[in-house]
Amino acid sequence: MYSPEEAAELKRRNYRSIREMIRLSYTVGFNLLDPSRCGQVLRIWTIVLSVSSLASLYGHWQMLARYIHDIPRIGETAGTALQFLTSIAKMWYFLFAHRQIYELLRKARCHELLQKCELFERMSDLPVIKEIRQQVESTMNRYWASTRRQILIYLYSCICITTNYFINSFVINLYRYFTKPKGSYDIMLPLPSLYPAWEHKGLEFPYYHIQMYLETCSLYICGMCAVSFDGVFIVLCLHSVGLMRSLNQMVEQATSELVPPDRRVEYLRCCIYQYQRVANFATEVNNCFRHITFTQFLLSLFNWGLALFQMSVGLGNNSSITMIRMTMYLVAAGYQIVVYCYNGQRFATASEEIANAFYQVRWYGESREFRHLIRMMLMRTNRGFRLDVSWFMQMSLPTLMAMVRTSGQYFLLLQNVNQK
């Protein structure tokens, strides 16, 4: 489909669309462009970040143990602990599935499935191919533009909440250091946690700096690991949707007047070959994210309820800082699941339209072999592609609505327990 020069330009253009995600992935130890041994040196940084974050779990546990009866105080502690534990799970999954993720991302960036499509080679002498190519390029460009928008919105949401946590703790500690006597104040860490042995050390070196390092590592991977991992999902999911839409556009022209009747069977076979490639790619994407996203969906059920509860507490105490922080947290955490469910719904819908595309061609006036291929494809496309969350649910808008309702019930439960 593409000449070598066009393929190189396409690869550069797609890289520019996701360059923020790729550059950010380096900072959490993921090299999405080089799976070789040299490119895997960054794995050491992944291990350092994950071990440091696991060490900070001690501070969260101590916070929970001391204030176990103060639900408003431990709610945020529990939520952030669950968040960085999920991020650690994603980081370690990246370590073991690095080659698989790299290959999928490479296929997407290079439009490998479109380049392998026999239609553009065997039917290159037909005038309809130029029209199809323009439609396919327009479709793929539209979905890659959508990919960039989603990644940037997600990135800015995570930057806002992580920056708020860090700057708020840093500024408050400096203010207390210069305005209050030594030993008369408690330090505030980026994430709510407690280290009893160093509780009265204040800002002394190295006690304060060790605590800040551990909690900053946890805070950083909460936001940036999410953007890196979920950003890959956005790229692969929307690229798959673009491939399905492009396949539909190819199939729709199977009985066009621009395709000679004696070549329509061969044309349809090329579409069937492309369908099989798209089906294999969609299955690989589903298998790659199927189980690891289950922890994220479970976490979001609790964290949405916790965030709503913290917002209600901040509203009752007239705490604007808590309200702003929880609002930003809810936006980032909510957008994370919206990305999965909304794109998963687009994925499933595009898959269902493939069968309709085969049925809508004017097959009733074609040869017996052509009609036989159409019947075969109607049977094969009867079961569409979808993105699953383990074995329990599907990434779709109904799943999103069910999660919102469940989180609301969890929020009401927390309020009732807090009032007793």
Curated annotation (Swiss-Prot):
Keywords carried by this UniProt record: Cell membrane, Glycoprotein, Membrane, Olfaction, Receptor, Sensory transduction, Transducer, Transmembrane, Transmembrane helix
Glycosylation sites: 318
Protein name in UniProt: Odorant receptor 63a
Protein topology in the membrane: Multi-pass membrane protein
Protein family per UniProt: Belongs to the insect chemoreceptor superfamily. Heteromeric odorant receptor channel (TC 1.A.69) family. Or63a subfamily.
Residue ranges, Extracellular side: 65-76, 172-217, 318-320, 409-420
Keyword Glycoprotein (UniProt): yes
Other comment: The atypical heteromeric and topological design of the odorant receptors appears to be an insect-specific solution for odor recognition, making the OR/Orco complex an attractive target for the development of highly selective insect repellents to disrupt olfactory-mediated host-seeking behaviors of insect disease vectors. Odor-evoked OR currents are independent of known G-protein-coupled second messenger pathways.
Subunit organization: Interacts with Orco. Complexes exist early in the endomembrane system in olfactory sensory neurons (OSNs), coupling these complexes to the conserved ciliary trafficking pathway.
Main location group: membrane
Gene Ontology MF annotations: ionotropic olfactory receptor activity; odorant binding; olfactory receptor activity
Protein function: Odorant receptor which mediates acceptance or avoidance behavior, depending on its substrates. The odorant receptor repertoire encodes a large collection of odor stimuli that vary widely in identity, intensity, and duration. May form a complex with Orco to form odorant-sensing units, providing sensitive and prolonged odorant signaling and calcium permeability. Involved in the behavioral responses to butyl acetate, isoamyl acetate, and hexanoic acid.
Transmembrane segments: 44-64, 77-97, 151-171, 218-238, 297-317, 321-341, 388-408
Cytoplasmic side: 1-43, 98-150, 239-296, 342-387
Any GO CC annotation of this UniProt entry: dendrite membrane
One Gene Ontology term from the biological process aspect of the record: detection of chemical stimulus involved in sensory perception of smell
Gene: Or63a
Protein localization: Cell membrane
